[in-house]
């Protein structure tokens, strides 16, 4: 048996400050245009279009270095690795919304709506497990899923009494995804090819995932 003595400062328990990263996330601008109208008291319609480029997400962090302009030790530095990842995997998203309502009678209204949302992921988007970023260094999980566009269709009716109203709606949300168990891009890298010649340039086929959803909602209300 041999006793080993370590200096008091050999191991330091991490404090809150050691595990805390203050960061700033700037989301992209959104451009939106819409129009709508009514025809007498019987028909109303509306259309809206929106665009947002998620590849322009920008992350920065506080490096606490001396800022000669501000005269202090607190400033924000752009997280280049994370911003490059956003640029390489995300893209502009288009959203279209349309809605129509027809008053069949003074009490009965019929409704129809449609939404389209394009996928924010690029077709060749991949999970990067190692990112030289202050916000995130390693990703322990290997699986990831790229989502497709969304199509949303709704229809319904509403009936109004003097103090009671009733609404019934059906909603269908259509979307799919491609699930990858791991990123196979590294199988073509030089060192991997040399170390694993039998697995060189191996690829994995994604699993198609059905994310369709059907929803029926019913509302009964009373006005006082």
Segments predicted by a language model, with ranges:
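Outer-membrane beta-barrel porins/channels
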Residues: 1-224
């Amino acid at each position: 048996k041999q006793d080993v003595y370590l200096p008091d400062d050999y191991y330091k328990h991490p404090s809150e400050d050691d595990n805390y990263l203050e960061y700033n996330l700037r989301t992209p601008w959104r451009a939106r245009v819409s129009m709508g109208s009514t025809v007498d008291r019987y028909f109303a319609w509306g259309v809206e279009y929106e665009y947002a480029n998620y590849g322009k997400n920008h992350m920065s962090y506080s490096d606490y270095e001396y800022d000669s302009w501000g005269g202090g030790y607190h400033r924000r530095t752009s997280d280049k690795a994370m911003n490059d990842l956003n640029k390489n995997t995300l893209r502009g998203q288009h959203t279209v919304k349309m809605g129509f309502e027809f008053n069949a009678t003074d009490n009965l209204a019929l409704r129809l709506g449609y939404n389209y949302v394009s996928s924010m992921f690029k077709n060749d988007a991949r999970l990067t497990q190692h990112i030289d970023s202050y916000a995130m260094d390693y990703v322990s999980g290997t699986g990831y899923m790229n989502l497709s566009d969304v199509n949303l269709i709704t229809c319904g009716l509403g009936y109004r009494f003097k103090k009671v109203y009733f609404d019934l709606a059906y909603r269908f949300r259509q979307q799919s995804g491609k699930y990858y168990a791991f990123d196979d891009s590294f199988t073509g890298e030089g060192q991997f090819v040399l170390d694993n010649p039998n697995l060189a340039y191996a690829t994995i086929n994604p699993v198609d995932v059905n994310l369709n959803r059907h929803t029926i909602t019913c509302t009964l209300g009373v006005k006082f």
